[in-house]
Swiss-Prot record:
Sites marked Transition state stabilizer: 201
Protein residues bound to NAD(+): 198, 223, 276-280, 438
An example Gene Ontology molecular-function term: 1-pyrroline-5-carboxylate dehydrogenase activity
Active site: 306, 340
InterPro entries for the chain: Ald_DH/histidinol_DH (IPR016161), Ald_DH_C (IPR016163), Ald_DH_CS_CYS (IPR016160), Ald_DH_N (IPR016162), Aldehyde_DH_dom (IPR015590), P5CDH/ALDH4A1 (IPR005931), Proline_metab_enzyme (IPR050485)
Protein name: Delta-1-pyrroline-5-carboxylate dehydrogenase, mitochondrial
Keywords for the protein's UniProt record, in alphabetical order: Mitochondrion, NAD, Oxidoreductase, Proline metabolism, Transit peptide
Amino acid sequence: MLRNTSRVLMSHFARANIPTPVNQPMLNYEVGSTHRKLLKEACAKFRNTTIDIPCVVGGKEIRTGDVQKQLICSDHNKVLATFHQANAELLKLAVENSMESKAQWESLPFEARSAVFLKAADLLNTKYRYDVLASTMLGQGKTVWQAEIDAAAEGIDFLRFNVKYAQEIYQQQPPANSAGCWNILTYQPLEGYVVAISPFNFTAIGLNLSSAPALMGNVVLWKPASTAVLSNWIVYKALLEAGLPAGVIQFLPGSGRLVGEHLFNNRNFSGLHFTGSTGVFNDIYKKTADNLVAGVYKGYPRIVGETGGKDFHFLHNSGDVENFVNNTLRGAFEYQGQKCSACSRAYIPQSLWPQIKDRLVTGVKSMKMGQSDDFSSFVSAVIDKNSFNNIQSYIEHAKASPDAEIIVGGKCDSSVGWFVEPTIILAKDPHYKSMEEEIFGPVLTIYVYEDSKFEETLKICDETSPYALTGSIFSTCRYAIETAHKYLKNAAGNFYINDKCTGAVVGQQPFGGSRASGTNDKAGSSLNLLRWISARTIKENFVPLTSFTYPYMIDPEN
């Protein structure tokens, strides 16, 4: 017993030297390379095989018989995978098993937990690399480079850097001790279980949402997006092969409604790690608040969410035109604008607009749109029919509106896949519909402002959208940059200067926004991990108290 207690305390202090994390180098998959050959083979394998994916509870694969399909979004007549949806009975079992598994997992020393995730990182970089890339490309519509920076590089970075951040947290101790006492901070996981709900657009996010709380000693129930089940299943298998014990992370594809009914109404619900739409997050937030008022929970659940965005590029008339154009083409249209950080509105000074317009139009027309596993494609299809219909509705609105003009793109074709051309809308009104509302597709709306109204337009940029995720200022004038800082300090949780508003790197740019974009708990940093632990202060006194009285009470005259 004493030895076990010693090991637990060791985990709180995290004295072991961990491997120093560095950002995972990205491969280019150039013609003739072995990497390109192996990735193409993996894509061909998944195109010609339908994978059947179970739920996993307590380490056991469970097939409920309620089967749904994940399609290849750029070729939607082809089924990439089938998956079994968790039902009410299974969700109840998952909660019970999680709570049964909790004590043993959280008692493992930090080094032992870390070893699981560090090994998983190496497995994703070797054995599982091409499978997770190919499944992300076909299932989620990512071209090879977009899959590489997500499913390989970012996913691996999350696993490695989170271990470093966790160690730094555990090493934080009170800086002072009064004479005769010792002060200790210990860090323990939350009292119940954590629910992870992940989106379709980043395989790495699904991995981080589930693994970050688990690294800190929590048990997790993970609901992956139905349009990203295959890639998420592959990273889950890597975690299991790395030694993740049964019951630590339960894998539960299925209905968001059922998850809400059964996982958020339980006394042991202690945290939510979420990435998805603002509307869904608001619904969950309200549900948990209502349950809290009703006395359902033991304590206050930790609610962590990264949601929508209406991200911007703002060009000052001193800005480098070529740099702005190239960063905007990438920021707006890579991955079909389906990054929560994607540039979807831009503000351009009138004096620079003619040359920028020509370059943007030329750039968009040169983009090849095709199958995601065609290595010459720059963009591919959007994720599903609902997304296609939503994006198309904004394009049709612009075509019919006297306040907007489509200057390039605008075609939509769902005959083979959910293809939407990269589209640029010129808005006469800075509050035009597509300047304000999140679209989540390859649609960029531009407002051209008078050069003399720079500050006025910055104010409009700040007040236009309810979101505050990412944004960029392009300028070579330091005064203009500082002015933008002043006006936009609350408009973007990740703010870029002369760079695109996408592409945050783990360990370099912690990611998250505020307002309607989420709780700004900064994935890829220790700030996020702090949400998954509860700190406990311990004071030990070494000097016995010999009297309860104080010196002021002693009167020598009495």
